[in-house]
Amino acid sequence: MQIPKGKKIYFASDNHLGAPTKEASLPREKKFVAWLDEIKQDAAVIFLVGDLFDFWFEYKTVVPKGFTRTLGKLAEISDSGIPIHFFVGNHDLWMNGYFEEELNIPVYNKPKEFTFNNKTFFIGHGDGLGPHDKGYKRMKKVFTNPVFKWLFRWMHPDIGVGIAQYLSVKNKLISGDDDAKFLGEENEWLVQYAKAKLENKHRDYFIFGHRHLPMEINLGQDSQYINLGDWIQYYTYGVFDGEKLELKVYNEA
């Protein structure tokens, strides 16, 4: 795909809307919606790269209460003809058709490659990738198991959502201290994952979230690893202008 002149591609991840409570996250949600409202002026494509919500589970006829401003703005942008792509994260992996049916937004459960202006973008949330994160990999197999999802669906939403919110805060899954530290290239497992991928095929950009830490790391071979940071502490996003990709900080006007 060639980006029209004057248009850009935007990337954001790790909003964790609803954490630690819906009331506490409302200012962050309003800031994110203001950003969406600004970028729609020149956006060719928008990528939401996981953990938009701190918890999301779609029942057969019910979705979580709240997030009206975000969902309404996404619907408006999608209806205007601007493509939006959504990658599930480890907090909102239980998508089941709502975004596709109501918002016309495709949802991806694993990394996917795109090409814009002859540059390749390898995009994913980042959870469970690379040589580490073994505990989460085991946990993800349980969470994505059809039997587990069926059993959870039979739990009353007030109970299920309450348990999920408690565990998220209790285990500091939002923005714990470990996520705020750069571990060095040799210990950043998403960097190692990207380098391993480069051994088989060249990509210009590897774009991930999950780490809650903005990073721009050159991998050699004219390839770059980008971590998008988050919308909890950093309010960072990626933007590709047709020639180069860079991280920026959103400062609301």
Identify the meaning behind each predicted range.
Residues 14, 252-253:
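Conserved histidine-centered catalytic loops in small-molecule metabolism enzymes
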Residues 126-189:
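Active-site-proximal loop/helix segment associated with metal-binding centers of metalloenzymes
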Residues 2-8, 12, 17-116, 233:
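Core catalytic region of metal-dependent phosphoesterases/phosphodiesterases
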Residues 44-51, 81-87, 121-125, 143-151, ...:
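Low-complexity, flexible helical/coil segments
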Residues 106-109, 122, 127, 133-139, ...:
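Conserved beta-sheet core of the metallophosphoesterase superfamily
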Residues 8, 45, 119, 204, ...:
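Conserved catalytic motifs of the protein kinase core domain
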